[in-house]
């Protein structure tokens, strides 16, 4: 007897329909074809034990299972449940006349309990597109799949539940998720708030500009200046995610199995990988590609603390994702693309010792140490960071001040208002949501300068030897500053402020070796051997 059961395979962040054909005929043997991986090939042992422990058995006949399309590789143990049901239905042990109306996924334990899977949300989205009436999956994954409207999602915990459902002995209730309630969660009780930060008004201004325009930012300052504290509070001033952004973010986390017992991810992600991370872990990849940290930070913030401590090769692989807002992983037989539209927030000490330019420190780096330290960050990578800002230690008077600081909620209102201006501006550009995403043509259109502003920018370009990409960055930041003030045109004072936020373009940070030799000798600093 031939039975068809339907499952799904996740490829990138999208799902594809898998047809599982189970045929039982005379003879002996268990034959599984259709490019299954080892986890699927081992499923017969899990299925046999699970069936035995609930009073069923594998038929003593020849079982042939085909997983179509046969040219698409199938991975993981999530096919245990549809395989088991297909065998039971094909052998006549259960009656399942409507089994072809459902997508079925789940891993079986030896006692018949059902374990969670990865990629439930993209599978549910594809199931709706393919016209299925329902989706049976582990109860731990039910909430994320139930985000998809007009699809009945049933969470199950044991194989017997599913058998009773198809035998019409037990009714299952669809899981319902209140999307509006999920969205309300993001504005309640933020873990970090800018009101916790004493002083640093100038840096808070930079963070506000970065949030308003989606600009990448690097914070440069000595240890204890508050760089990490400021970075962790950036998500609290970003505008709330819309439904499309929340779905995109949840899909990525779902593929990695990070959404168990949760519904929609409605809070912008904040990812802070350790500096020992590999390039594959950062951007994604592997023999069977998985999203990396930059995709996990999609629609949120990626924080790289102590940027020069990362391997240069790791930092360089970020150049393409920073520009294209997506990461493409190519293999011989396929290509996978993951979304990676994130805000990069990086921090670094100004020198290996952490106290370069500190007038109170008598221990400074040698010129060789300084060049080696700064050489880990390439010019092309820095060009892709819109805002470079120096963070100075907070004086005691500010730390001991008992007056209340401005809250994240207050800053977020201004940021949201600026984003609304950008939404109206880019209505005709569906792939652009904020100023940082503008290309050269759009910069020329929306960042027109008067003669005063143009002359000011020309002088800055010549004196700082800025690249064409840095020129575009300054214009984007100036446009955001104007949006925060609800100004129609970019003025010279907007340009002047934006130029200030290019610290690493100035001599003294990325200057010649002779500068550091001159600096260390003039300060009388003791040079450390490299």
Q: What is each model feature region?
A:
Residues 1-218, 222-228, 330, 470-471, ...:
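Peripheral, non-AAA+ core regions of ATP-driven protein-machinery
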Residues 18-24, 282, 386-389:
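Short beta-strand elements
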Residues 39-44, 59, 66-76, 288-289, ...:
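Basic, amphipathic alpha-helical bundle interface domains used for macromolecular binding and assembly
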Residues 170-209, 213, 240-294:
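P-loop NTPase nucleotide-binding/switch module
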Residues 219-258, 324:
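Walker A/P-loop
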Residues 221, 284, 306:
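The Walker A (P-loop) glycine that initiates the GxxxxGKT/S ATP-binding motif of P-loop NTPases
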Residues 299, 305-306, 317:
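Walker B catalytic acidic pair
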């Amino acid at each position: 007897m031939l039975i068809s059961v339907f499952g799904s395979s996740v490829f990138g962040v999208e799902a594809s329909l898998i047809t599982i054909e189970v045929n039982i005929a005379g003879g002996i043997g268990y034959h599984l074809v259709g490019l299954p991986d080892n986890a699927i090939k081992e499923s017969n042992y899990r299925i046999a034990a699970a069936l035995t422990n609930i009073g069923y058995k594998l038929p003593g006949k020849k079982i042939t299972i085909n997983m179509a399309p046969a040219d698409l590789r199938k991975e993981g143990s999530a096919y245990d449940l549809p395989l088991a049901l297909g065998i039971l239905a094909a052998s006549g042990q259960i009656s399942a006349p409507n089994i072809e109306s459902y997508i079925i996924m789940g891993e079986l334990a030896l006692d018949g309990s059902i374990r969670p899977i990865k990629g439930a949300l993209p599978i549910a989205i594809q199931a709706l597109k393919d016209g299925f009436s329902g989706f049976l999956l582990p109860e731990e994954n039910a909430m994320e799949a139930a985000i998809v409207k007009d699809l009945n999602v049933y969470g199950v915990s044991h194989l017997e539940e599913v058998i009773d459902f198809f035998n019409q002995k037990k009714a299952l209730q669809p899981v319902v998720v209140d999307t509006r309630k999920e969205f309300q969660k993001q504005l309640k009780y933020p873990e970090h708030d800018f009101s916790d930060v004493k002083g640093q008004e100038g840096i808070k201004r930079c963070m506000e500009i970065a949030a308003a325009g989606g600009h990448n930012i690097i914070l440069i300052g000595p240890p204890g200046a508050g760089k990490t504290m400021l970075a962790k509070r950036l998500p609290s001033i970003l505008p709330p995610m819309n439904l499309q952004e929340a779905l995109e973010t949840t899909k990525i986390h779902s593929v990695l199995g990070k959404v168990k017992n949760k519904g929609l991810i409605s809070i912008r992600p904040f990812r802070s990988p350790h500096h020992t991370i590999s390039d594959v872990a950062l951007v994604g990849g592997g023999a069977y590609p998985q999203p990396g940290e930059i995709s996990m930070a999609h629609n949120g913030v990626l924080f790289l603390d102590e940027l020069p401590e990362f391997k240069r090769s790791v930092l360089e692989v970020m150049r393409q994702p920073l520009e294209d807002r997506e990461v493409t992983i190519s293999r011989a037989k396929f290509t996978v693309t993951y979304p990676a539209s994130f805000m990069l927030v990086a921090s670094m000490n100004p020198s290996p010792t952490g106290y370069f330019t500190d007038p109170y420190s008598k221990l400074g780096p040698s010129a060789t140490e300084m060049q080696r330290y700064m050489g880990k960050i390439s010019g092309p990578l820095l060009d892709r960071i819109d805002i470079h800002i120096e963070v100075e230690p907070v004086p005691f008077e500010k730390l001991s001040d008992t007056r209340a600081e401005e809250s994240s909620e207050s800053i977020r209102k201004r940021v949201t208002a600026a984003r609304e201006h950008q939404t109206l501006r880019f209505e005709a550009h569906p792939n652009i949501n904020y100023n940082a995403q503008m290309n050269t043509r759009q910069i020329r259109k929306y960042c027109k300068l008067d003669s005063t502003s143009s002359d000011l920018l020309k002088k800055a370009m010549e004196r700082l030897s800025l690249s064409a990409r840095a020129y575009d960055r300054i214009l984007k930041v100036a446009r955001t500053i104007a949006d925060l003030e609800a100004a129609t045109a970019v003025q010279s004072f907007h340009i002047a402020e934006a130029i200030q936020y290019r610290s690493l373009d100035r001599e003294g940070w990325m200057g010649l070796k002779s500068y550091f030799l001159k600096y260390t000798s003039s300060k009388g600093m003791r040079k450390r051997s490299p």
